Amino acid sequence: MYKTIYVPVDNSDHSNMAVELGVRFAKIFGSKIVGSHVYAAKMHDKRFKQMEAGLPEEYHDEKELDRQRQIHDSLITRGLQIITDSYLDFVDQKCAEANIPLERRSLEGRNWKALAEDITKNGYDLTIMGALGVGAVKDSVIGSNTERVIRRVRNSDMFIVKDTKPMNGGKIVVAVDGSHYSFGGLKTALALGKAFNKPVEAISAFDPYFHYAAFH
């Protein structure tokens, strides 16, 4: 059902649970996991250039500025790559423990944009990502990066992790409205229910006053 499972990570609690669930899905469906992290070295380079005007006078020489830019760029890029590797090492460890094949991907750019482009380009069967990340704001239900990715991806099933507790018990609920998308969701839910031994419940909502208001 899912040959490739894409898991973006940022070392947050929701991200770590996404990794745990990704491994669980991969064991059931015989999938390969693709772990990714996005870092923004170019953004740091841009911010450094914006701050150059505030540097001491001795650094305003163009040659010295160029030297400082190269040093800054090298340090930032290397530092962000080390952080990225440490995040992906966690995915590597979990996959190795479960004997799951893993592909590591380090991406550069704006988080949501790089993720949406990577998913769209490679067409991963399933994407599992946390609803919130390290930049979570108190009382947030879903983070801006996750929301933007969901709104832009059309070729991958999306599993958004909202609870950092293990997925035990409970049931799968499907909202149906007669569209082919909702019936596709129902078919997916039935397959997942069978795979995870969970009951499936289909629900539909209607507004008894809609037609009266619309046609009178």
Positions of the model-derived regions?
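Short secondary-structure transition/capping segments
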Residues: 79-87, 118, 151-156, 204-216
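Glycine-centered small-residue hotspots that permit tight backbone geometry or close packing
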Residues: 11, 35, 91, 109, ...
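Charge-dense, low-complexity intrinsically disordered segments
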Residues: 9, 71-74, 78-82, 136, ...
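Structural beta-alpha unit
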Residues: 14, 40-46, 50-52, 65, ...
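Conserved active-site and cofactor/substrate-binding residues in soluble primary-metabolism enzymes
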Residues: 82, 86, 144, 184
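Small/aliphatic-rich secondary-structure junction motif
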Residues: 1-70, 98-100, 171-216
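Gly/Ser-rich helix-loop-strand patches that form or flank binding pockets
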Residues: 14-15, 21, 27-28, 104, ...
